[in-house]
Design a protein with these regions (language model features):
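Conserved metal-binding segment of the jelly-roll/cupin
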Residues: 81-88, 92-94, 102-104, 409-422, ...
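C-terminal, well-structured subdomains that either form a transmembrane helix-short loop-helix hairpin
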Residues: 411, 566, 574-589, 644
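Long, structured stretches of catalytic cores involved in phosphate-ester chemistry, encompassing
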Residues: 573, 617-628
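Active/binding-pocket-proximal capping segment
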Residues: 592-607
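Sequence-structural signature of mature extracellular/luminal beta-sheet repeat domains
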Residues: 693-968
C-alpha cells in the first residue's frame, strides 16, 4: 500500500514558462494526467475499441460513437460518467454533453480530442462548438436540444485535452453556459487563429491551460447569475484577450497570463465583479485590464497581490480613457479596488479608486496552490472490490469501516452506499468518488441511531487535526433523522473537501436517474408528505479547529437547519465557490471563527422553504475575507427579509465584491446589518466594505412614522385632497391615510392582488391588479385595471377596457399614468422605455390613460404626467434613473440616462428636484447632482408628495408608513 501524498503545487506555471524554471525536483506536474490507470465503475461507460467502433490514433472520425457513449449514460443512469482512455480522438461535429454527464480521461497521458485542419462546417458562423453543455436530452427527436441553463448541474470534462488545428476559425472548444457545480478541470486548450477556448462560463475552471486563439474565455453572465472561479490556470498568446467578460462575477486566483495584449477586457457598457489575486501578468502589450461602466456600483474591481512583468499599462477605464501605467519592468499590485466603497459602516459610501503598487527588483516565485493533489490512482482501493454493494439497500457500514481501518485512499465508484452509523475517518484517510450525484454515502429515513433528541451525530466525521481529502461524493442524511449532521469536519488546514453534494431537496436523484419530488402541488411543503423541512442539524459542520480547502460544494438540503456551520476554529480555512440554498432558518453561520478566506459564497432562498431565512450570520468572529459574495432571493418571493448578512460582536470582516438581488420587488431591506450598533448597509452593490469595531448608532431618522405593522407596502398615490393611498400586496389591501384626521383607513380588500394605484381627474381610484397561482416575476399572470369610488369600493368596482392607441383622439389625452419604476429591465433600458406600446386602458374620466406596457404589473409606483412633459423612471435591475419625454399621443420617447442611481421610485418635484427611492431617499437637482438624502428607518419603496398644501412627502417603507415635511 502506497502512502497517500499531499503534494502542493509549487510554481506550477513554471512548467510552461521557461523564464522561471526554478521548479523543485519533487514537484508533480499538475498538467500531467491525474488518473493514470483505469478506474473500474460498473455503472460508467468506457469509450474503448472493445465497446465502440473507434480508433484512438486520430485516423478515424469518432463523433457519432462519442455521442453514442454519452447517450448510453443518459439512457441507463441519466447522470454518470464516460471514461475515455489515452489516445487521439478526431471529431467533425458538435458533441452534446447532456445534463449531469461527465467525461473523464485516463492513462499515462491525457486523451486528446482533435478537430483536424479545415474540418468542414467550422469556417464561419456562430455556435460552432466541439462540446456543448446542454440541458436534458430531448425525449423526442423532433424536439430541439436546449442550451444548459440554471438547472444544469454536475456536468463536466476532466483530464482531457482539446486541440483545434488551423482552418477552423469559427470553432469554439466548449460552450459552457451551465449552472453550479459543473467544471472544466485539468485540460489543455490548444487553439488556432479565430478560435475561442470557452464560450460563456459556468462554475469552475481549474488547472487548465489555454494556448493561442483569439480568446481563452469569452463570456457573459452565468446561467443562474452566480459567480465563477478560474483557478490555478495558464493563458498564453491569445490574439485579442485572454478573457473577455461581462457580469460573470469572476474570481481569478493563482493564474499566469503571458504574451497577450490584454488579460481581462470587460465589454463596453457592461459591468463586472472582478476579483484577481496571487496571479502573474507577463509581457502584456496593451492595458492588462480594461474596465467599463466605471461609474456604476455594479462595477466592482478588486485586485490583490499581482506580479506584473513587462506590463507598462496595468489598467484602463474604457469610458474616461484614464490609465494606470508604470515605468518599472517589474512591480507588484498589492491592492487595487474600484467601485462603491465603505471605509467603515459609519461613513457615507462613494465610488472611488484606491491602489497600492510597489516596484520590485526581482519577481518572486509563483504562489503555490492550496489545492491538494490526489495520490496516484494505482494506490486507490475500490470499495466494491472489498464487498460493498452500493445499491442503496444493502448495509455497507462494516465494509466501509474495515476499509478505513486498513487503507489510506478509498475509491467509491458510482453507487449509493447505505450506512447505519457514523463513518469516522482516520487522520490520513481519503474518500474519493468522481460524481456526487450518483456516488453517495447515505442514510435511510428513520435510521435508528439518528432518532430522538441528542448531540449532533455525523454521517461522516474527520478527526481533529487530520489530513484528509473527501472528494466527488454526495452525503445524504435523508429527511427523517433528527440527530443527523451530514459531515462533522475537524481535519486541519492541509485537508480538502471538494466536489461534494449535501443531498436532499432540489436536484436529488435515485440510482436510475429519477428525480425525488421536491414539493407538494403548491410548493408549500415537501413532496414526500411524511418529511418536514428544518428537522436536522447542519449539513457541513466545521468545528474544533477544523480547516482546509473547501471547493465546489453544494448544500441545498432543506431538512438541515443550515447548509454550513463553522464554529470554534482559528485554523486556516479557504472556501472556493460554495453554494448554500433552500434552508428555512439559516444558510450559513460563522461563530467564533478567525483566519478564513471565502471566495464566491453563493446564498439563495426559495419561496417555499426560505421566505424568512437569514442567509449569512456572523457572530463573535474576526479576520475573515469575503470575496465576491452573492445573496439572492428567487423570483417567487412575495415578502422581503430584513437583511442578507447579520453581524454580531465581530470585527475585521473584509467584504470585497458584495451583491444582493432578486428579480422581484421584495429585496433585502439591508445588505448587511450589525446587531450591536444597529447600523444597516442599504446599497445592494458594494465593491469594498470593512466591518470593524462599531459604536452604537445615535442619529435619529429624518422622518416621522405614521403607521406600521404591514407586510410590504408600496404603490402609493395621492387623491385630489392630498390624501395618500397605498397597497399591502400580500394581504390584498388598499389603505388611505386621512391627512385631516391623521388616521389610517382601510379602503378595501380585493380577491385579486393590487399592484399599484392612481387617480383620474374625477376622483376614481385606478388599480392595476394581478392574479397568479404560482408567484414569479416570470409568470405575468392575469393583469387587469379596475376603477372604483374609494368611498364606496364594493358598489362601484368595474374593469377598464384595453383599447388600441390608434382608437384614441390624441387631443383628448390630458393625463398619462406611467410606471415610475421598472424593476426587471437591466440592459438596453433606453430601448425598453421607448418600446412601442400598442394599447392602453382609458379611465372613466375619458382623458386619463394607462399605457399597457408588457411589464405594467412589475412596478412599485405609478405616477401621473401630461403629454409634452418630462418624466423620470427608475430601473431596479440596472440601478439607474432615466428621463423620458411623453409625446402628444401619450407615448414614451427620447429616454436618456439621468443619474447612476435608481431602484423603486422616482418623483419629480415642483422645484425641479427629483426624489429617488434607492436604499434611502436621494435628492438630485435637475442637472443630476446629488444634494442630500433623507434617512428612512426602513428601506423605502414608494414616495408621493401630498398633504393639504402639497408639502409633505409620504413614504411607503416595508412595514412602515412615514412622512416628512418638505421645506421651501
Amino acid at each position: 500500500m502506497k502512502k497517500y501524498l499531499f503534494i502542493f503545487l509549487l510554481m506550477f506555471i513554471t512548467l510552461v514558462s521557461p523564464g522561471f524554471s526554478q521548479t523543485p525536483a519533487n514537484v508533480v506536474d499538475p498538467y500531467a494526467s491525474i488518473y493514470q490507470t483505469r478506474l473500474d465503475d460498473a455503472l460508467a461507460v468506457y469509450f474503448t475499441p472493445e465497446n465502440f467502433t473507434i480508433t484512438a490514433d486520430g485516423s478515424t472520425d469518432v463523433s457519432d460513437a462519442l455521442q453514442e457513449a454519452i447517450n448510453k449514460v443518459q439512457e441507463t443512469v441519466r447522470y454518470g460518467i464516460v471514461f475515455i482512455p489515452e489516445g487521439i480522438y478526431r471529431i467533425s461535429k458538435k458533441i452534446n454533453l447532456w445534463k449531469g454527464v461527465r467525461l473523464i480521461g485516463y492513462g499515462k497521458k491525457r486523451p486528446v480530442i482533435l478537430l483536424g485542419k479545415n474540418t468542414p462546417g467550422f469556417q464561419d458562423g456562430s455556435g460552432k462548438y466541439l462540446f456543448h453543455f446542454v440541458s436534458d436530452r430531448p425525449w423526442r427527436n423532433t424536439q430541439q436540444v436546449a442550451d444548459a441553463n440554471a438547472g444544469t448541474f454536475y456536468t463536466g470534462i476532466r483530464n482531457i485535452n482539446i486541440r483545434i488545428e488551423e482552418g477552423n476559425q469559427a470553432a469554439v472548444a466548449v460552450r459552457y453556459h451551465a449552472a453550479q457545480h459543473c467544471f472544466l478541470s485539468h485540460m489543455d486548450f490548444n487553439l488556432s487563429a479565430g478560435n475561442v477556448g470557452v464560450e460563456d462560463i459556468c462554475n469552475e475552471i481549474e488547472f487548465c491551460r489555454f494556448f493561442g486563439g483569439d480568446y481563452g474565455i469569452k463570456t457573459g453572465k452565468t446561467a443562474p447569475g452566480w459567480q465563477t472561479l478560474i483557478i490555478d490556470s495558464y493563458f498564453e498568446k491569445q490574439g485579442k484577450a485572454s478573457i473577455a467578460t461581462e457580469e460573470a462575477e469572476m474570481l481569478i486566483i493563482r493564474n499566469h497570463f503571458r504574451n497577450v495584449p490584454t488579460v481581462v477586457s470587460i465589454n463596453e457598457n457592461r459591468s463586472e465583479q472582478l476579483w484577481i489575486s496571487d496571479s502573474r501578468f507577463e509581457n502584456i502589450t496593451s492595458p492588462a485590464i480594461i474596465v467599463s461602466n466605471e461609474n456604476h456600483p455594479k462595477t466592482q474591481i478588486n485586485l490583490k497581490d499581482i506580479i506584473c512583468i513587462n506590463t507598462p499599462d496595468f489598467l484602463q477605464f474604457r469610458g474616461s480613457g484614464q490609465k494606470i501605467s508604470l515605468k518599472e519592468k517589474i512591480y507588484q499590485v498589492k491592492e487595487f479596488s474600484h467601485g462603491l466603497h465603505y471605509e467603515n459602516m459609519s461613513v457615507w459610501p462613494e465610488i472611488k479608486t484606491i491602489s497600492n503598487i510597489e516596484p520590485l527588483k526581482k519577481a518572486p516565485m509563483l504562489v503555490p496552490s492550496d489545492i491538494p493533489q490526489l495520490a496516484s490512482t494505482d494506490s486507490w482501493v475500490n470499495i466494491k472490490s472489498l464487498g460493498a454493494v452500493g445499491n442503496g439497500v444493502a448495509d455497507d457500514t462494516e465494509i466501509l469501516k474495515k476499509a478505513i481501518a486498513n487503507y489510506t485512499t478509498i475509491y467509491l465508484p458510482s453507487g449509493h452506499y447505505r450506512v447505519t452509523e457514523p463513518i469516522i475517518l482516520k487522520p490520513g484517510t481519503n474518500i474519493i468518488g468522481l460524481h456526487p450525484s450518483i456516488t453517495q454515502i447515505m442514510l435511510r429515513d428513520s435510521t435508528a441511531i439518528y432518532q430522538g433528541i441528542g448531540s449532533p451525530l455525523p454521517l461522516l466525521e474527520t478527526p481533529q487535526g487530520g489530513i484528509n481529502i473527501v472528494s466527488g461524493i454526495g452525503l445524504n442524511t435523508s429527511g427523517m433523522n433528527p440527530r443527523a449532521v451530514a459531515a462533522k469536519w475537524m481535519a486541519g488546514e492541509k485537508s480538502m473537501m471538494n466536489d461534494v453534494r449535501f443531498t436532499g431537496g432540489h436536484g436529488t436523484y435515485d440510482l436510475k436517474g429519477r428525480e425525488v419530488r421536491v414539493y407538494n402541488d403548491n410548493r408549500t411543503a415537501d413532496g414526500i408528505p411524511y418529511r418536514k423541512w428544518d428537522t436536522q442539524n447542519w449539513s457541513l459542520w466545521i468545528t474544533n479547529g477544523g480547516g482546509g480547502t473547501f471547493k465546489d460544494i453544494w448544500a441545498p438540503n432543506p431538512y438541515a437547519s443550515a447548509g454550513l456551520f463553522v464554529s470554534d476554529t482559528q485554523a486556516g480555512g479557504r472556501i472556493y465557490i460554495m453554494s448554500i440554498e433552500h434552508h428555512v432558518r439559516n444558510e450559513a453561520i460563522f461563530d467564533h471563527v478567525s483566519n478564513w478566506r471565502i471566495y464566491g459564497l453563493q446564498l439563495e432562498e426559495e419561496s417555499g422553504e426560505g421566505p424568512h431565512c437569514l442567509p449569512l450570520d456572523i457572530r463573535n468572529s474576526n479576520n475573515i475575507l469575503f470575496a465576491n459574495t452573492f445573496s439572492y432571493r428567487v423570483s417567487r418571493m412575495t415578502t422581503p427579509y430584513p437583511y442578507a448578512i447579520r453581524t454580531e460582536n465581530s470585527k475585521d470582516l473584509y467584504f470585497r465584491g458584495l451583491r444582493t438581488y432578486t428579480w422581484t420587488k421584495y429585496l433585502f431591506d439591508n445588505t448587511l446589518y450589525d446587531a450591536g450598533s444597529g447600523i444597516g448597509i442599504r446599497p445592494r452593490e458594494i465593491a469594498y466594505l470593512n466591518v470593524t469595531s462599531i459604536e452604537n448608532q445615535s442619529s435619529k431618522p429624518d422622518v416621522e412614522k405614521l403607521a406600521d405593522g404591514f407586510d410590504f407596502i408600496d404603490g402609493a398615490t395621492i387623491d385630489h385632497e392630498g390624501n395618500p393611498y397605498f397597497i399591502d400586496y400580500k394581504w390584498q389591501r388598499i389603505y388611505k391615510w386621512n391627512v385631516l384626521q391623521k388616521k389610517l383607513e382601510l379602503i378595501c380588500e380585493l380577491p385579486v392582488y393590487p399592484v399599484s394605484l392612481s387617480f383620474d381627474t374625477e376622483g376614481n381610484l385606478l388599480v392595476v391588479t394581478r392574479y397568479v397561482q404560482i408567484e414569479s416575476v416570470f409568470n405575468k399572470g392575469d393583469v387587469k385595471v379596475i376603477a372604483m369610488n374609494p368611498d364606496n369600493p364594493a358598489g362601484t368596482i368595474r374593469e377598464l377596457k384595453e383599447v388600441p392607441f390608434s382608437s384614441i383622439d390624441k387631443s383628448k389625452i390630458k393625463n398619462v399614468v406611467y410606471q415610475a419604476s421598472r424593476y426587471r429591465i437591466e440592459h438596453n433600458v433606453e430601448a425598453a422605455l421607448a418600446a412601442p406600446v400598442n394599447t392602453c386602458f382609458v379611465a372613466p374620466d375619458g382623458i386619463t390613460i394607462i399605457p399597457y406596457t408588457q411589464d405594467l404589473a412589475q412596478t412599485y409606483s405609478l405616477k401621473v404626467s401630461q403629454p409634452g412633459k418630462k418624466i423620470y423612471v427608475s430601473s431596479n435591475a440596472a440601478q439607474r434613473t432615466y428621463s423620458v419625454d411623453i409625446d402628444d399621443r401619450g407615448r414614451f420617447v427620447n429616454p436618456s440616462l439621468f443619474v447612476q442611481d435608481g431602484e423603486t421610485d422616482a418623483l419629480a418635484m415642483p422645484d425641479g428636484d427629483v426624489y429617488i427611492s434607492s436604499g434611502n431617499i436621494l435628492i438630485y437637482n435637475s442637472n443630476g447632482v446629488l444634494k442630500r438624502n433623507i434617512d428612512v428607518p426602513e428601506r423605502p419603496s414608494s414616495v408621493v408628495l401630498g398633504g393639504k398644501n402639497r408639502d409633505i412627502l409620504f413614504i411607503c417603507a416595508r412595514k412602515g408608513f412615514y412622512c416628512v415635511k418638505i421645506s421651501d
